[in-house]
Amino acid sequence: MRVTPRTLQNYKKTARPIVTLTAWDYAIARLVDQAGVDVILVGDSLAMVALGYENTLPVTLEAMIHHTQAVCRGVKNALVVSDLPFLTYQESLSQAIHTAGRILKETTAQAIKLEGGHPAMAETVERLTRLGVPVMGHVGLTPQSVHTLGYRQQGNTELEATRVIQEAIALEQAGAFAVVLEHIPATLAQTITEKLTIPTIGIGAGRHCDGQVLVTADLLGLSEKAPPFAKQYLDLDNLITNAVQRYSDDVRTQQFPPHLGS
């Protein structure tokens, strides 16, 4: 049965942890979906993972649509959420509506995700949800703000913690169906999780969130530089390199293709 935003909200009520991973193409999406995750996020992290950029900022709306289309073709059960890329929704409400509309109309994603919970962003979320667009929020460390906030942990001071709490609450009140809490203290994440009636999805935010998300490339060992809070379950980087080296050796020593006789 297909996971929906309502499914995730029911999971919070029953204390069932929500499993989320990213995907950027058909092959990864198909495998992640087969493994039984609840949510597949087509994150703008594909800018680094799939396109080789240093951060998420350069990825375009066209690229996000292209990759989301590929991911959706590989998914049968998980909820697919697509990130809105940098400066494709922050300028105005009309821009946000246009961007979200393109993603939902040109792909088969079921929801979008955007960053920030300040008053203008909460207004954007409220407008989108009123138009029928399911929105996942994102507070704490917001990678699209790398040039102003950096990649440091957020919420360490009382002022910062209050801001993150207020933003999460504002997103819920605006109609978001879930919110990502990134790289904040575990105690702060627990406080937010207890205050909200919508699910919290943590990444580098401790174990007291309603669910967890990782960048799949970090999990598989494909990232050149994974964040300190990521856990690597497989060293696919070395496995792929070794397989390619073995193939190269076989070709150069004429062991491949095998001799099939005359």
UniProtKB/Swiss-Prot annotation:
Keywords carried by this UniProt record: Cytoplasm, Magnesium, Metal-binding, Pantothenate biosynthesis, Transferase
Residues forming coiled coils: none
Major localization class: cytoplasm
Pfam families the record matches: Pantoate_transf
Active-site residue numbers: E182 (proton acceptor)
UniProt entry tagged with the keyword Ribosomal protein: no
UniProt key word Calcium: no
EC class name: transferase
Catalytic activity: 3-methyl-2-oxobutanoate + (6R)-5,10-methylene-5,6,7,8-tetrahydrofolate + H2O = 2-dehydropantoate + (6S)-5,6,7,8-tetrahydrofolate
EC number: 2.1.2.11
Function summary: Catalyzes the reversible reaction in which hydroxymethyl group from 5,10-methylenetetrahydrofolate is transferred onto alpha-ketoisovalerate to form ketopantoate.
Protein name: 3-methyl-2-oxobutanoate hydroxymethyltransferase
Lineage: Bacteria, Bacillati, Cyanobacteriota, Cyanophyceae, Oscillatoriophycideae
Gene name tied to this protein: panB
